[in-house]
From Swiss-Prot:
Record's keyword terms, sorted: Cytoplasm, Exosome, Nucleus, Phosphoprotein, RNA-binding, rRNA processing
Quaternary structure and interacting proteins, as annotated: Component of the RNA exosome complex.
Organism, scientific name: Dictyostelium discoideum
Family matches, as Pfam families: KH_6, Rrp40_N, RRP40_S1
Subcellular location: Cytoplasm; Nucleus, Nucleolus; Nucleus
Protein name: Putative exosome complex component rrp40
Residue ranges occupied by any S1 motif domain in the UniProt entry: 67-137
Chief location of this protein within or outside the cell: cytoplasm
């Protein structure tokens, strides 16, 4: 895997064999058995802090793929559907019946500006994306409106890292702060905690994790918690 690190790769290039390596792969990479292939053109990057490989390119905008879990904002409300901003070039369509238990007489009470956690079901360059607030089992299972809290924008690579099963960062945060989190692969993270201060700490920790080593994360959290007053949430470009 290291032989192509910081090298330009194109779709179809064999990046290497994972074997027994304990690494994670992110945007632009696909694992087939124990082989990792490039699916987009760009520079292969590796974070030694997070043991995380991904392909970095000029893509700034999220490109929907079927089964992606994303965070969206309601931008239009219609009788039986909603338009949702998911950060892609086109808004997504959400049916009012794509919620657990939804019927003609029991539709979700969503308004423009509301946040939702949803799943992409249609992603075709010739059609607008479609999303649902249901799991593959047709249950809510965490999908639906995100009430309260704070939404943080981050890189697509960081959002994929946060979704990994053994994400060290979220484990350490959970030791010190009770919180809820929803992570979208479209580079959006929703956080809700018991207080504004704790929500700020979680947000700042996630944002700054891109620039500090794993062994610096816990001291960063403890220092942040010791501050009684903060000036506000992280600034974003």
């Amino acid at each position: 895997m290291d032989t192509l690190k910081d090298q330009f790769v194109v779709p179809g290039d064999v990046i290497g064999k994972i074997g027994d390596l304990k690494v994670r792969i992110g945007p632009g990479l696909l694992q087939t058995k124990d082989t990792v292939l490039a699916t987009k053109a760009g520079v292969l990057r590796y974070s030694k802090f997070h043991r995380f490989y991904w392909i970095e390119n000029e893509q700034k905008r999220y490109v929907p793929q079927v089964e992606d879990m994303v965070i969206g904002t309601i931008i239009e409300k219609h009788a039986e559907s909603f338009k949702v901003d998911i950060g892609s070039s086109c808004s997504a369509l959400l049916s009012a019946y794509s919620f657990e238990g939804a019927t003609k007489s029991n539709k979700p009470l969503l308004n423009v500006g509301n946040l939702i956690y949803c799943r992409v079901t249609v992603a075709n360059r010739d059609m607008e994306p479609e999303v649902v607030c249901l799991s593959q089992k047709q249950k809510a299972e965490g999908f639906g409106q995100l009430i309260g809290g704070y939404m943080l924008n981050c890189s697509l690579g960081l959002s994929h890292y946060l979704l990994s099963e053994d994400c060290f960062l979220l484990q350490i945060l959970g030791k010190h702060i009770p919180y809820e989190i929803a992570v979208g692969v479209n580079g959006r993270v929703w956080i809700n905690s018991g207080s504004n201060h704790n929500t700020i700490v979680v947000s700042n920790t996630i944002y700054n994790s891109q620039y500090i080593q794993d062994d610096q994360i816990e001291p960063f959290i403890l220092k942040s918690l010791s501050i009684n007053e903060t000036s506000g949430l992280v600034e974003q470009n």
